[in-house]
């Protein structure tokens, strides 16, 4: 068996097109232009690329893009002051602070300071609690992208067994909540789980989000399963030249693709969906803040 490739570029492009249509409607009918802001502390190369791509995508969707680059030595107090400034800015409907931040800044303190209604990344404890309670919430972009891709590949997910490898607040826990909402039977596995390969082999939907390159082997995959690889790991690539690297996922792609029914590639998979879902979240936030109803299928 050779798996169908779940093309993140195609699905993300479709979602971004829907976002652009909704942005155009908001401009025409309500004179409202959604705005997404990103705060970057320091000069991490991967974060800089990611922030730049977010800005391009935001502008292409017809939205306002705001970027704030702060030096790595910026104090936690000054970062929190910038967060409060964005909380109060009516032109900014959604924003995020790009992680990781320097070690002297508490990531949780930053998350807690964000106004939950502007929490484009869906990480605030209030949004996490509402998601767990089945209430309307800002949903983390990467988990939302995972579920969209799983539904595209697997259709109706109701009754299927989903196994998530990873229990982070950023991906593992929220993707589990979203799959429960889709009426899946959900198992969360992690580094302390016993006999992890046998747990993974039970999955109709296998989500790998552990940050370990190639951890999930082909014999971990149930034949015909949908495999969603959230990992983005940079590993040495001597074949490209001295000091060169390449991106790989948490799944050993070539092995898993021989067993799975459908699989996301890295790159070209979940990462592209994350940006598209951030744009969608910002439009949702803009509508909620202005009492504007969204289309039912948005």
UniProtKB/Swiss-Prot annotation:
Binding site residues for NADP(+): 166-168, 191, 232
Annotated GO biological process: L-histidine biosynthetic process; methionine biosynthetic process; purine nucleotide biosynthetic process; tetrahydrofolate interconversion
Q: Could you tell me which pathway this protein works in?
A: One-carbon metabolism; tetrahydrofolate interconversion
The source's domain of life comes to: Bacteria
Q: Which Pfam families does the entry link to?
A: THF_DHG_CYH (PF00763), THF_DHG_CYH_C (PF02882)
This protein's record includes keyword Oxidoreductase: yes
CDD domains per the record?
Answer: NAD_bind_m-THF_DH_Cyclohyd
Going by the UniProt record, its keywords in alphabetical order are: Amino-acid biosynthesis, Histidine biosynthesis, Hydrolase, Methionine biosynthesis, Multifunctional enzyme, NADP, One-carbon metabolism, Oxidoreductase, Purine biosynthesis
Tell me a GO cellular component: cytosol
EC number, UniProt record: 1.5.1.5, 3.5.4.9
InterPro entries given in the database record: Aminoacid_DH-like_N_sf (IPR046346), NAD(P)-bd_dom_sf (IPR036291), THF_DH/CycHdrlase (IPR000672), THF_DH/CycHdrlase_cat_dom (IPR020630), THF_DH/CycHdrlase_NAD-bd_dom (IPR020631)
Q: Which GO terms describe its molecular function?
A: methenyltetrahydrofolate cyclohydrolase activity; methylenetetrahydrofolate dehydrogenase (NADP+) activity
Query: What is catalyzed by this enzyme?
Result: (6R)-5,10-methylene-5,6,7,8-tetrahydrofolate + NADP(+) = (6R)-5,10-methenyltetrahydrofolate + NADPH; (6R)-5,10-methenyltetrahydrofolate + H2O = (6R)-10-formyltetrahydrofolate + H(+)
Cite the record's note on assembly: Homodimer.
Family statement drawn from the similarity comment of this UniProt entry? Belongs to the tetrahydrofolate dehydrogenase/cyclohydrolase family.
What's this chain's function? Catalyzes the oxidation of 5,10-methylenetetrahydrofolate to 5,10-methenyltetrahydrofolate and then the hydrolysis of 5,10-methenyltetrahydrofolate to 10-formyltetrahydrofolate.
Entry protein name: Bifunctional protein FolD
Q: Which organism is it from?
A: Parvibaculum lavamentivorans (strain DS-1 / DSM 13023 / NCIMB 13966)
């Amino acid at each position: 068996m050779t798996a169908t490739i779940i093309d993140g570029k195609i699905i993300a492009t479709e979602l971004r097109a829907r976002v652009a249509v909704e942005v155009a409607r908001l401009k025409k009918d309500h004179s409202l232009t959604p705005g997404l802001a990103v705060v970057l502390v320091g000069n991490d190369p991967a974060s800089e690329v990611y922030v730049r791509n977010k800005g391009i995508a935001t502008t292409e969707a017809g939205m306002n893009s705001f970027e704030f680059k702060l030096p790595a030595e910026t104090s936690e107090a000054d970062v929190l002051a910038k967060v409060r400034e964005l909380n109060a800015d009516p032109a900014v409907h959604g924003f995020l602070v790009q992680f990781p931040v320097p070690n002297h800044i508490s990531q949780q303190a930053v998350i807690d300071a964000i106004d939950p209604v502007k929490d484009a990344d869906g990480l605030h404890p209030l949004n996490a609690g509402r998601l767990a309670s089945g209430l309307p919430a800002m949903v983390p972009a990467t988990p939302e992208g995972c579920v969209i891709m799983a539904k595209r590949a697997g259709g109706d997910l109701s009754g299927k067994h989903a196994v998530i490898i990873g229990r982070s607040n950023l991906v593992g826990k929220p993707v589990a909540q979203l799959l429960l909402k889709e009426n899946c039977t959900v198992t969360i596995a992690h580094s302390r789980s016993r006999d992890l390969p046998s747990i993974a082999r039970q999955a109709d939907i296998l989500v790998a989000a552990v940050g370990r390159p190639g951890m999930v082997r082909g014999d971990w995959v149930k034949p015909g399963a949908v495999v969603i690889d959230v990992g983005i790991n940079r590993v040495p690539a001597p074949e490209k030249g001295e000091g060169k690297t390449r991106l790989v996922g948490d799944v050993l792609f070539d092995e898993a693709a021989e067993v799975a029914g459908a699989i996301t590639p890295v790159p070209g998979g979940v990462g592209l969906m994350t940006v598209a879902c951030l744009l969608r979240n910002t439009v949702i936030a803009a509508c909620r803040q202005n009492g504007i109803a969204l289309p039912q299928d948005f």
